[in-house]
Amino acid sequence: MQAAWLLGALLVPHLLSFGHGARGHGKEWEGVWGGALEEERDRESLMLKNLQEALGLPTGVGNKDNLAENSEGKEVWEATETQGEEEEEETTTTPSSSPTPFPSPSPTSEDTVTYILGRLASLDAGLHQLHIRLHVLDTRVVELTQGLRRLRDAASDTRDSVQALKEVQVRSEQEHGRLEGCLKGLRLGHKCFLLSRDFETQAAAQARCKARGGSLAQPADRQQMDALSRYLRAALAPYNWPVWLGVHDRRSEGLYLFENGQRVSFFAWHRALSPESGAQPSAASHPLSPDQPNGGILENCVAQASDDGSWWDHDCERRLYFVCEFPF
C-alpha cells in the first residue's frame, strides 16, 4: 500500500510537469485550449492505470490520495498558468503601445556646407553637360550653314546657267528669224522683209518680230517703200489686205515715229482721187476713200495697203497681217 502511494507521489509531479509543458507549448492554440485540457486529464488517468496494472497493484489503491494530490497540482498549475497569461498579456500589450519617437538630430554647419557643396557639384555637372550639348549644336549649325551656303552657290550657278541658256536660245531664235527672213522674204540692201499671215495687234506683231531678231518694217525712203509695195502685192494678190508697219503717233498726235524711236521723214498716205483727174470720186461710196490720216487720237498706228502700197491709220488694237524687218 505504501509502495503504491510512493510510486504515485513520484509520478504525479512528472506528469503534471509534462502537462504544464504541453500547456506551455499550447499557448499558440488558445482558441482550442478547453478541449485539450480534458484530453490531458484522460491521458494522465489512462497512463496511471496502465502503470498500476504493469506493477500488479490494485487499480483502486491510492485513488483518493492521488485525487487530492491531483487537485493540489491542478490548483498550482492553474495559478502558474494564470500568472503566465498575465505576463504574456503585459508583454503583448507593451509593444502595441506607440513607441516613443527619437528626437532627430539638428543639422550642423558642417552638414549645411556639405549639402551646399553637393548641390554646387550637381549644378556644375549639369552645366558641363549643357556646354557639351551647346558645342554639339554649334557644330551642327556651322555644318548646316556651310551646306546652305553651298546650296545657295549651286542654285546661283544653276540660275546663271539657265539664264545663259535662255540668252543662247534667244540669240538662236533671232538668228534663225533673220536667216528665215532673208531666205524666204525680200532682201533689200542691208534689210530683209518677211510677211507674216497671222492676225495680231500692232503691239503683239512688234513683239513677235522682236523675238525673231527684227522689228516691224520701217521703210526709210521711196526706194524701200516701192520695193516693199511690190513684195506685198505679189504675196497677197489678188486681194487687198492692210499690213502693219512699224510707224505710230502714240507718243504725240501727229508726230509719227518708227519703232526704234526715230522720226518718220517719208510718208505715203492714201489720197482720194480729185474730180479734175477725170476719175469718179468715191468718197460717198467707199469708207477707205477719205484722205489719210483721219482717225485722230482713236487711230494711232499705220498699216500699208497691199494693192497700191498707200498708208492708212488704224486703231492699234485691230488684228492685221504684219511684215517684219531684219538686219542683214
UniProtKB/Swiss-Prot annotation:
GO molecular function, one term: growth factor activity
Positions of the C-type lectin domain: 188-325
Keywords of this entry: Cytoplasm, Disulfide bond, Glycoprotein, Growth factor, Lectin, Osteogenesis, Secreted, Signal
Keyword Signal: yes
Domain of life, source organism: Eukaryota
S-S pairs: 209-324, 301-316
Alphabetized SMART domains for the sequence: CLECT
InterPro entries tied to this protein: C-type_lectin-like (IPR001304), C-type_lectin-like/link_sf (IPR016186), C-type_lectin_CS (IPR018378), CLec_Tetranectin-domain (IPR051663), CTDL_fold (IPR016187)
Protein name: C-type lectin domain family 11 member A
Gene: Clec11a
